[in-house]
C-alpha cells in the first residue's frame, strides 16, 4: 500500500488560500497527503485559512504554526525552521513565501531532507538555482516548481503540435499579464519593492517559461525596463515592466506586466500569448486569449475580484465544484499542477520504500532524472 506523505506549507498568504491548501486538502481525501501543517509569520492568515474551507472540506483541518489563537501582533519569522526540523525525513515542504524569501526556505527544507514544491519563480538568481539543483540531486530530493500554466490544456495541445512540427519554428512573440490594482494595497507593498523584484520577475516568468515549455527553446538573454510608483505605505516599487527575452535560436519574446488591471474591470486580470513561427514557404501561429474563456457572471453582490459584480470567469485554472463526495472538489490546471508535483513526491518515496540507503538514493535519483527528461513539471 502506498503511504501518504506529510506536507508543511511555509506561507499563509494569497496563493495558499486561493490554490494550495484546497488542492492539498483534496489530495488528503484521496490518500496522497497525510498530516498538514502550515507556518506563517503571524496568526491572522492562519485564522482565515482555518475558517475558509469548512463548507468545501468538512471535517478536514491543519496544524497552525503559530496557533491561530495567538495574539495577531506577534511575529514568528523563524518558526518555520523549528517545524521543518521536526518533520519526518523525505516528506514535502510547500514554499509559498514572497519571492525574495524562496531561496532560504528551499535550502532549509533541503537541509532537513525534505522534497519541495515551490511556487514560481523558484529563486531570483541563476547561481541559487544551480546550488539548489545540486544539493537536491545529491540527496535524492525532488524539487517541483509550480508553473501551473504548463498544465493548461491549451499549452499542452500547443506543445504537442509544436513537437510534431505543425507550426514551424518560433521566431517572434508577445505576452501580457497585468495583475489587479488591489494588489498594491495588499502585503505586496511590504516586499514588492524596487530592490527586490518587479512585475516581469513575478508574473512575466510564467510566459517566459511557457514559451520554453511549448518549444523546448531556452532563453539566453533577458533585458527589462520598468515604471516605478508608490504603494499606499510609501514604499517604492515597479508597478509596470516590459521584458525582452532572446531564445537560443534567436527568437524574440516581448512580455508586458504590471500591477494595474482596474479593480472595476471584468478581468480579473489581463493575460495573453501570441507566437509567430516560420515554416517552409509559410508561417504558423499560436494565439491564446488567457483572460476571456467564454464565461461571464454578473453577481447580485460584490463577490468578484476586488468586490466586483461582473466578471469574466476562468473555469480552467481553479474552481471548487460539486462532486460525488463530501463538500466540493478543486478542478482545473492549477490543481493539476499541485497534484502532479505531490503525486511525484509520493511516487518517489513509494518506489524507494524499504530499500537500503544506497539503493534508495539511486532509485530516487533515477525517477528525478525521468521527470526532468519528461519536462512536464518544471524543475531546477
Please name every model-derived segment.
Residues 131-149, 169-173:
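Rossmann-fold dehydrogenase core element
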Residues 113, 119-121:
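Short helix/strand-capping hinge loops at secondary-structure junctions
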Residues 1-112, 130, 134-138:
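N-terminal glycine-/serine-/threonine-rich beta1-alpha1-beta2 phosphate-ribose binding loop
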Residues 202-307, 312, 317, 323-363, ...:
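Contiguous beta-strand/loop segments that form the cofactor/metal-binding neighborhood of enzyme cores
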Residues 149-236, 242, 361:
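Predominantly a Rossmann-like dinucleotide-binding segment in NAD(P)-dependent oxidoreductases
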Residues 94-95, 118, 175:
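Redox-cofactor binding/interface segments in oxidoreductases and associated redox assembly factors
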Amino acid at each position: 500500500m502506498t503511504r501518504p506523505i506529510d506536507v508543511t506549507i511555509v506561507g499563509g498568504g494569497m496563493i495558499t488560500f486561493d490554490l494550495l491548501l484546497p488542492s492539498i486538502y483534496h489530495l488528503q481525501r484521496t490518500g496522497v497527503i497525510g498530516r498538514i501543517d502550515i507556518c506563517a509569520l503571524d496568526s491572522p492568515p492562519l485564522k482565515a485559512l482555518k475558517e475558509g474551507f469548512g463548507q468545501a472540506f468538512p471535517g478536514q483541518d491543519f496544524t497552525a504554526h503559530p496557533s491561530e489563537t495567538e495574539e495577531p501582533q506577534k511575529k514568528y519569522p523563524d518558526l518555520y525552521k523549528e517545524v521543518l526540523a521536526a518533520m519526518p525525513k523525505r516528506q514535502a515542504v510547500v514554499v509559498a513565501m514572497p519571492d525574495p524569501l524562496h531561496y532560504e526556505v528551499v535550502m532549509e527544507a533541503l537541509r532537513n531532507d525534505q522534497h519541495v514544491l515551490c511556487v514560481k519563480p523558484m529563486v531570483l538568481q541563476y547561481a541559487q538555482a544551480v546550488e539548489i539543483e545540486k544539493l537536491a540531486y545529491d540527496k535524492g530530493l525532488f524539487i517541483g516548481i509550480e508553473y501551473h500554466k504548463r498544465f493548461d490544456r491549451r499549452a499542452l495541445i500547443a506543445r504537442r503540435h509544436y513537437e510534431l512540427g505543425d507550426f514551424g519554428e518560433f521566431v517572434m512573440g508577445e505576452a501580457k499579464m497585468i495583475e489587479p490594482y488591489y494588489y498594491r494595497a495588499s502585503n505586496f507593498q511590504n516586499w514588492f519593492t524596487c530592490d527586490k523584484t518587479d512585475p516581469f520577475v513575478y508574473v512575466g516568468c510564467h510566459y517566459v517559461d511557457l514559451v520554453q515549455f511549448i518549444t523546448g527553446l531556452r532563453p539566453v538573454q533577458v533585458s527589462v525596463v520598468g515604471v516605478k510608483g508608490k504603494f499606499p505605505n510609501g514604499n517604492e516599487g515597479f508597478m509596470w515592466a516590459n521584458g525582452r527575452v532572446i531564445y537560443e535560436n534567436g527568437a524574440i519574446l516581448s512580455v508586458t506586466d504590471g500591477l494595474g488591471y482596474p479593480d472595476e474591470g471584468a478581468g480579473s486580470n489581463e493575460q495573453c500569448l501570441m507566437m509567430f513561427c516560420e515554416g517552409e514557404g509559410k508561417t504558423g501561429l499560436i494565439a491564446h486569449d488567457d483572460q476571456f474563456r467564454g464565461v461571464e457572471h454578473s453577481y447580485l453582490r460584490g463577490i468578484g475580484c476586488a468586490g466586483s459584480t461582473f466578471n469574466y470567469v476562468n473555469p480552467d485554472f481553479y474552481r471548487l465544484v460539486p462532486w460525488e463526495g463530501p463538500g466540493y472538489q478543486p478542478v482545473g490546471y492549477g490543481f493539476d499542477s499541485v497534484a502532479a508535483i505531490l503525486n511525484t513526491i509520493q511516487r518517489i518515496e513509494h518506489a524507494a520504500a524499504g530499500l537500503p540507503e544506497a539503493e534508495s538514493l539511486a532509485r530516487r535519483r533515477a525517477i528525478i532524472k525521468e521527470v526532468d527528461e519528461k519536462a512536464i513539471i518544471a524543475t531546477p
